[in-house]
Amino acid sequence: MSRLKEKFNTEVTENLMKEFNYSSVMEVPKIDKIVVNMGVGDAVQNSKVLDNAVEELELITGQKPLITKAKKSVATFRLREGMPIGAKVTLRGDRMYEFLDKLIAVSLPRVRDFHGVSKKAFDGRGNYTLGIKEQLIFPEIDYDKVSKVRGMDIVIVTTANTDEEGRELLKQFGMPFQK
């Protein structure tokens, strides 16, 4: 069992029960899934770029990404409906906890001028979205093999009803929010 899952079962559940006065353990919010999305706009001209992005995303998450396709045609971007333009991975279960642990303990501290993640990136339903400017912060990525610096979106979906509950859940896991 991963370190964060164990922490959730022992400490986090108790702390949240006390803080929000839940009557049942089943009311305690938990992390449902983590979606890692990488939009690759350059894939329109060169499909090789998408292969590199997929490979990097697989290294980072340990799971094969799903290639996302364009929903609409946009003439200004030379984009046709159904063209591959990105990749995403949905993590659940143990892999999700492992990824979150790695993100909090290793990757985020490697960001340049890092002062914590924004407290305002909640969507009103307790889900948290985090944008990362470069994939180099992950230890699996070899600096010499990177052809282009790419960013990604990480969405942490929780079962929390409010942003306050979601924020407290992530804070208990050790998410470094700004002061």
UniProtKB/Swiss-Prot annotation:
Role description: This is one of the proteins that bind and probably mediate the attachment of the 5S RNA into the large ribosomal subunit, where it forms part of the central protuberance. In the 70S ribosome it contacts protein S13 of the 30S subunit (bridge B1b), connecting the 2 subunits; this bridge is implicated in subunit movement. Contacts the P site tRNA; the 5S rRNA and some of its associated proteins might help stabilize positioning of ribosome-bound tRNAs.
Subunit structure: Part of the 50S ribosomal subunit; part of the 5S rRNA/L5/L18/L25 subcomplex. Contacts the 5S rRNA and the P site tRNA. Forms a bridge to the 30S subunit in the 70S ribosome.
GO terms, biological process: translation
Transmembrane annotation, as ranges: none
Keyword RNA-binding appears in the UniProt entry: yes
InterPro entries with a match to the protein in the record: Ribosomal_uL5 (IPR002132), Ribosomal_uL5_bac-type (IPR020930), Ribosomal_uL5_C (IPR031309), Ribosomal_uL5_CS (IPR020929), Ribosomal_uL5_dom_sf (IPR022803), Ribosomal_uL5_N (IPR031310)
PROSITE patterns reported for this sequence: RIBOSOMAL_L5
Gene3D superfamilies (alphabetical): 3.30.1440.10
HAMAP family in alphabetical order: Ribosomal_uL5_B
Disulfide bonds: none
Species of provenance: Staphylococcus carnosus (strain TM300)
Keyword Phosphoprotein on entry: no
Name of the protein: Large ribosomal subunit protein uL5
Family: Belongs to the universal ribosomal protein uL5 family.
Organism domain of life: Bacteria
A GO term, aspect molecular function: tRNA binding
Protein keywords: Ribonucleoprotein, Ribosomal protein, RNA-binding, rRNA-binding, tRNA-binding
Cellular component, GO annotation: ribonucleoprotein complex; ribosome
